[in-house]
Amino acid sequence: MRVEVGQIVNTHGIKGEIKVKSNSDFTDVRFQPGQVLTVVHNNNDLEYTVKSHRVHKGLHMLTFEGINNINDIEHLKGSSIYQERDHEDIVLEENEFYYSDIIGCAVFDDQKTPIGRVINIFETGANDVWVIKGSKEYLIPYIADVVKEVDVENKKIIITPMEGLLD
């Protein structure tokens, strides 16, 4: 099964580099040189091998092997990028999850009160932060003191909110 790992938002320069907004985890592995990515453009699957990767202003800057000119890549702006979900170089440790398993999960507090659903995840360096959409939008740190249970199979998460977290 493949998962969406990003979207091409623009080009950069004239040598075929693209700007990718990632919506995936493990980007250090998924976007490393030599990895094969599938770009879906006009319902066609186009496979590209990553030639280079760097991060600039929160976006992933990629070049693909065989693409050396902006004209060869510009038409792909807005296209989604996919990769196989179960990547051979990614080993999940205990309490690690694929973003695609967490996004969409219903979130409840430890009293079983519904809070909302996970709509996005972003990395802060220290820990991931889950964006929960309910009556309001909440930012929930993925730390053991807050997230008590993750049931991927039933798409359910239990948290113990620290004081002020849901205000």
Swiss-Prot record:
Keywords: Chaperone, Cytoplasm, Ribosome biogenesis, rRNA processing. GO terms for cellular component: cytosol; ribosome. It is found in: Cytoplasm. It holds the Pfam family PRC_RimM. One of its GO terms (molecular function) is ribosome binding. GO terms for biological process: maturation of SSU-rRNA. Gene3D superfamilies: PRC-barrel domain, RimM. The PRC barrel domain binds ribosomal protein uS19. An accessory protein needed during the final step in the assembly of 30S ribosomal subunit, possibly for assembly of the head region. Essential for efficient processing of 16S rRNA. May be needed both before and after RbfA during the maturation of 16S rRNA. It has affinity for free ribosomal 30S subunits but not for 70S ribosomes. NCBIfam families: 16S_RimM (TIGR02273). Belongs to the RimM family. Binds ribosomal protein uS19. This is Ribosome maturation factor RimM. It comes from Staphylococcus aureus (strain NCTC 8325 / PS 47). The gene is rimM.
